Amino acid sequence: MALPILLDCDPGHDDAIAIVLALASPELDVKAITSSAGNQTPEKTLRNVLRMLTLLNRTDIPVAGGAVKPLMRELIIADNVHGESGLDGPALPEPTFAPQNCTAVELMAKTLRESAEPVTIVSTGPQTNVALLLNSHPELHSKIARIVIMGGAMGLGNWTPAAEFNIYVDPEAAEIVFQSGIPVVMAGLDVTHKAQIHVEDTERFRAIGNPVSTIVAELLDFFLEYHKDEKWGFVGAPLHDPCTIAWLLKPELFTSVERWVGVETQGKYTQGMTVVDYYYLTGNKPNATVMVDVDRQGFVDLLADRLKFYA
């Protein structure tokens, strides 16, 4: 039986590839997709979800737009990474369908209510929508199997020295998620920076030769440009968000640890930092499964294998 999932995302090149991977995987049943502001403005990330589902011929999946700004802060976007549209690079189709006439939280709540079994929430942007769902629908917590997020880091940040972008955009929301008591799985920079796609991997995807694998290669062509900056020391482009989906499909590709994670919302230099109690110094009970390593080649092979689905 396929695992029911709700996908909350802010596409975003790597979010788009996470959608591609999820919908190529019969092990997963994507019940709905909601959009959050983050990599681009809320209007653009919603449009990008619709464009991707139009490309993938999955206009049957309900879509709703989410919060237009973080819980307590002004919105920050990553247009320097993802371009003016949020998905610069390939020529994507215009949407052929409309989002639901409801908010992301309403669609999430409806999906949870109607599911016969608990649903896994996969959140690859800021945690705003998920936090709003948790706060407004405590009666539905038992319908959530787990929350798998791309965000945070045990070590270095990528938006500030201490903070990863998704958590930095809305640290208050992330704190709500980590404190919820629901199992959380964290794909932070410690693992996603090891999930790099090299130029030869992109060419492998392109050579698969179907329309979707070609678009994925073109997304990666654009995404790689930002990551060529010497300051990162990368060989390729880190494919952050698909790590969440890959973990659901093949957890054996990942090394993870159970630890307590807190989110810094006040710090002078550390706002948005995920504080991971690696050495059990706080006495707090672990509240998260934290991914720390990945079999990079296995990850690339999984992507290549699933891209053939779209032939």
Swiss-Prot record:
Residues passing through the membrane, by range: none
Record text on activity regulation: Subject to catabolite repression.
EC number per UniProt: 3.2.-.-
Name of the top EC class for this enzyme: hydrolase
GO cellular component terms attached to this protein's record: cytosol; protein-containing complex
Keywords from the UniProt entry: Glycosidase, Hydrolase
Record-linked CDD domains: nuc_hydro_IU_UC_XIUA (cd02651)
Single GO molecular function: purine nucleosidase activity
GO BP annotations listed: nucleobase-containing small molecule interconversion; protein homotetramerization; purine nucleoside catabolic process; pyrimidine nucleobase metabolic process; pyrimidine ribonucleoside catabolic process
InterPro entries: I/U_nuclsd_hydro_CS, Inosine/uridine_hydrolase_dom, IUNH, Pyrim_hydro_RihA, Ribo_hydro-like
Catalytic residue positions: 240
Entry keyword Aminoacyl-tRNA synthetase: no
Keyword RNA-binding assigned: no
A Pfam family that the UniProt record links to this protein: IU_nuc_hydro
HAMAP family noted in UniProt: Pyrim_hydro_RihA (MF_01431)
Note: Strictly specific for ribonucleosides.
Function: Hydrolyzes with equal efficiency cytidine or uridine to ribose and cytosine or uracil, respectively.
PANTHER family: INOSINE-URIDINE PREFERRING NUCLEOSIDE HYDROLASE, URIDINE NUCLEOSIDASE
Similarity comment: Belongs to the IUNH family. RihA subfamily.
Annotated protein name in UniProt: Pyrimidine-specific ribonucleoside hydrolase RihA
The organism of origin for this protein: Escherichia coli (strain K12)
